[in-house]
Amino acid sequence: MPATRFSPRTIWLILADAAIIYGGIVLAMYVRLGVSGSEYQLNDRNGWEKIALASLVCLLILYFYDLYDYTVMGNRRELMLRLVQALGIAWALLALLFYFVPSLLIGRGVSVISVPIVLVLLLVWRIFIHLLTGHPEIGEKILVVGTGKSAIDTAEAVWERRDAGYRIVGFVTENGATPHTKIGESEIVGTVDELDSLIKTEKVDRIVIAVRERRGTFPTETLLKMSLAGDVNIEECTSFFERVTGKVHIDMLRPSWLIFAGRRRDTRLKIVIREVAHRGLALAGLIVSFPIAVFTAIVIKLESKGPIFYRQERVGKNGRIFKVIKFRSMRTDAEKDGKPVWATADDNRVTRIGGIIRKIRVDEIPQFWNIIKGEMSFVGPRPERPHFVEQLAEEILFYEHRHLTAPGLTGWAQIKYPYGASVEDARQKLQYDLYYIKNQSLALDLVIIFETVKTVLFSRGGR
């Protein structure tokens, strides 16, 4: 399953959390009201539906607190802290909801008792899952063919994503390297001539091919027989890496892979629906954010002389140049020598108000107008300045391909990679942009929008 979506393990975790929260509240109701009182509330007062709503609110807050990130479960102190905060926020929101809509109330006593019950159940469950997923026998067993950079990068992607459900059992080599040579957390377990026996002894579920040169000793016949017999799944490292990490590894790419693995062509109707939806959402966003925009314009004008808005040339779809609109967040002499400069962390050109509005993304509000005009979409690769595009296209392979789709207000690269100001940062972001272009869909757009909202609410900021 692509890394853009929830992995199967994460989906099971969400479902288990839902059952635990739901069951915990029901248990609290029985503790507080007894059998007869609970059955009356559940059956005659729509208690089942009320508890379902409360459970949904809790799940959303758990998501916003990154409690479906498996790395959080490895730190029990952090896990406990986040669970307490998340459940506290969830029950505060529910209290507010019950105040305005009393018919949804499940009972104050029940609410108070359910908090510690749900907290303990979730904590024990998360610790158990962490111990279980760390067991070496749990997960699909992967044998990597190759020992070069692509092979190592593929294995490291698996080691970094414990939640993906894979285990590297070892590497096989073509050049007769010494068996049992350590490579990261695993080792060389044999050569390509031993593939047949290794599949059985290591109980391999999937072979990942991570060698570029496929002449000479490459075991084409052996792999063909295995594939046709259905003994084991066989996959290119490029596709496997993409699925695990949610990005396309540029160093592994061949033009042929981009051609044959490209996304299916959208129908004209789907394109029109997407454009209408994006423009409609942008118009709604412009209306809803109007009071914030007016207030922002006033404080910008009060703080420093100069225009309220900042217009700058950017490269759009198919290389077309357009002017992006933002609230001005830098001094008017930010580029007094006329040369474009990368934005950096703690950039001293940013004004005090500018720092605040950039942190909570308010400076991006005027870009709703760019979306309405059709120059941008809600979701897509962030538009870059022509000067930097020209520079990066010379240094980074496939860079121009990010302009095959409309630029976005937010994007896959923005939620997956921290902000950067270098060629290497641009290279890393391109890998996420290519993934988005290849896998673009409504479901992926919704995931990105949801993650962006989470980022804004927790003030992780921008540049």
Residue ranges and their predicted role:
Residues 1-138, 166, 274, 463:
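Signature of alpha-helical transmembrane segments in polytopic membrane proteins
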Residues 2, 15, 22, 26, ...:
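A solvent-exposed beta-alpha-beta segment
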Residues 83-87, 138-157, 307-330, 352:
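Membrane-cytosol interface motif
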Residues 176-181, 238-251, 310-352, 410-429:
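Short, glycine-rich, amphipathic interfacial segments at transmembrane boundaries or analogous
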Residues 187, 245-284, 308-312, 342, ...:
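Glycine-rich flexible loop motifs, especially short His-Gly-Gly/GGXG/HXGH segments used as catalytic or interaction
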Residues 270-334, 370, 442, 447-463:
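A hydrophobic, helix-centered structural microdomain
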Residues 343-406, 448-456:
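A short, structured surface patch at a secondary-structure boundary
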Residues 373, 387, 394-463:
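C-terminal terminal-structure detector
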